Structures are given as structure tokens and as C-alpha cells.
């Protein structure tokens, strides 16, 4: 699986130009059909997702090109999931209140929060390393708010640093989280 931008036309252009590389061997990825279509629950309703599949011209391994709008093996868009994580970090309300705010079942939101809580130290450290790689003089997030707060703060600090470095008007917290984690922000391990 390879994480790519959400713009389908841009992904097709990059595939045709040979700009995507295989994570296994570094070879060039070429188009190879599509993965199965599925519907994600977005903030404003259902979102149809039919990710592109690619095949390495070097080693022959196939990869699904997952857009930064989705997390691996999740039925909701990254925007919904990351907004729930951010709500927990900033307001410190319970999972039922967050579930009501994002209009998702309470057990689903509790699962997201638990999975993220299991990984907060790994998430914080990975995003902090990326922050130092992107920004020569990074503004480090405040520490001491607890693991959950620190991990979400590291994601936010990296998103801000990417915006400054590449002169982007806004960099989504969700897209940053998906891009850096390779879609595996809530994956086991």
C-alpha cells in the first residue's frame, strides 16, 4: 500500500509519468487496475472510494494507492477520525460526547480513541522526527499535556511546519496524519 494525494487526476498523471516508486524495491509503479470500491462515511455524508492499484515494473509487486483522505481498514474518512482524536486532545470530553459531535456510534469512536491511546508514544516520536526533518528550526509542541495531547500536538506542529516550508495556505491535520503514517495511524503494531 502506498499513500498518495486525494486528487485522482494528479495520481493518474504521476502514474503515467513514472513518478511513483515501489516501497519494496524503488522501481517505477505503473497502473494496474483498481482496488475494490467502497463507501466511506465522510463529515457531510457518504464518500465513494475506488483506489487505484499499481504494479512495480521492477519486482512485479502490486500496491493499492490509498489517498490521504482515508486510513487503512477504516469505514470513516480520515477527517472524521482525526477530528475525534483532536477533540479528545483539546476538550478532554468523553467518547460519547465526541461520538455525538462527529455523528458516529459511540463504540466506534471509543475504538479509535483506545487504538490511538495504545500508540501515542510511537505517534508522538515519529511525528516529532518528521517535524525536525521538515523544519530547520522547528517550533516544538508543548509537552506535558499527557500522551494523547502530546501526540496530537506533534501532528499539528508538523502540519504547521509543512505549511510554512512549502508556502501552503492550509495543511490538513488529517492529511498530515495519513501521509506520515502511511494510512496506518490506527493500525495494529
Provide a role label for each language-model segment:
Residues 33-35, 96, 165, 184-185:
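Compositionally biased, intrinsically disordered low-complexity regions
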Residues 55-144:
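Short, positively charged, Gly/Tyr-enriched micro-motifs
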Residues 5, 12, 19, 48, ...:
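Glutamate identity and glutamate-enriched acidic tracts
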Residues 21-24, 37, 54, 69, ...:
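Generic serine detector
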